[in-house]
Amino acid sequence: MSPATGAQHRGGEPAHRRGAAPAIRLPATEHTSRPWRIHELTRDFRLEDVWALPAPGGPSDFPRLVALMATADPSQGSSRVARALWTTRWKLGELLGWDGPDAGTGSRVRTLRDRLPAGLRDGPSGPHHDALPFISLYLTQDEWAAETANRTMHGVLHVSWVADRSGGYRGQMAVLVKPNGLLGAGYMAAIRPFRYLVVYPAMGRQIERRWQADAGNPPPATLSGCT
């Protein structure tokens, strides 16, 4: 158990040299050592991954990253292998009933919004995710958290904005999960190699392209006042 969060972690790999890959897997401590508000909500979740995102910027660029992440669709990226994996996943979910309305938040599991302290509950929840079944939990100046649930697991996507050693800032993403019994544990173990070898690299390239293409564009007005 992590002393900072109570969440379990599978063991991160050391960060690689900057620029070696579009998305770089980081040690668990890059998430657990920071005073994120998400720690209050996920003590019974396992920290699955921490990634440095190819999205460098200044102190006020976090809303732009949130807008990008909320509209990203990894199932429509340039990698044919990644697209095929996503298509297979959605078809399996439909066939096996993994993604039905009785499997999500508010039915199979309680939403983590029920755990929000007053300061977060009364603040902005964040954007709606356009492509994936994530529901926003909260949005601050340097954190955005969203949850999803299905028959296999209850998961949290945590996107943050951290200072780097060069005096700038960069995006960071953490994935936390609570597998649903043996089915969930087996599913998470089965997809792990595909996530590391195909899904996350393709997603990193997609983020990098869009981040560079959107440079200089203001974030949506609904995100420009993150508090």
Label every PLM stretch briefly:
Residues G106-P127, L132, N217-T227:
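An exposure/low-complexity boundary signal
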